[in-house]
Amino acid sequence: MNPLIQSLTEGQLRTDIPAFRPGDTVRVHAKVVEGTRERIQIFEGVVIARKGAGISENYTVRKISNGVGVERTFPIHTPRVDKIEVVRYGKVRRAKLYYLRALQGKAARIKEIRR
């Protein structure tokens, strides 16, 4: 990578991100701006994918809300995310869990592991 670009992005990288992988259940505290007010909105779900590297890395979180699947993609190093909490660690054998979109109910559960 170009040294100039690398030096610019190093200052933007966050160091308070916990280690999490696809299959883990996370609670994302996202900052939402409504008019002039800013509030924290919590989005809790299963990480189904992580993509990219460095400053452009992002992850997708999926949850079921009122019987409807909702997915949100967050950049890892964005200032719009206040904090990320890992609720539980899941045991999966894939890097991308897109197959969970087709499953529902107990079939969509992920086995928990102790870390």
Curated annotation (Swiss-Prot):
The keyword Ribosomal protein applies. SUPFAM superfamilies: Translation proteins SH3-like domain (SSF50104). Keywords: Ribonucleoprotein, Ribosomal protein. Pfam families: Ribosomal_L19. GO terms for cellular component: cytosolic large ribosomal subunit. One of its GO terms (biological process) is translation. One of its GO terms (molecular function) is structural constituent of ribosome. The keyword Magnesium does not apply. InterPro entries: Ribosomal_bL19 (IPR001857), Ribosomal_bL19_CS (IPR018257), Ribosomal_bL19_sf (IPR038657), Translation_prot_SH3-like_sf (IPR008991). HAMAP family: Ribosomal_bL19. Belongs to the bacterial ribosomal protein bL19 family. This protein is located at the 30S-50S ribosomal subunit interface and may play a role in the structure and function of the aminoacyl-tRNA binding site. This is Large ribosomal subunit protein bL19. The gene is rplS.
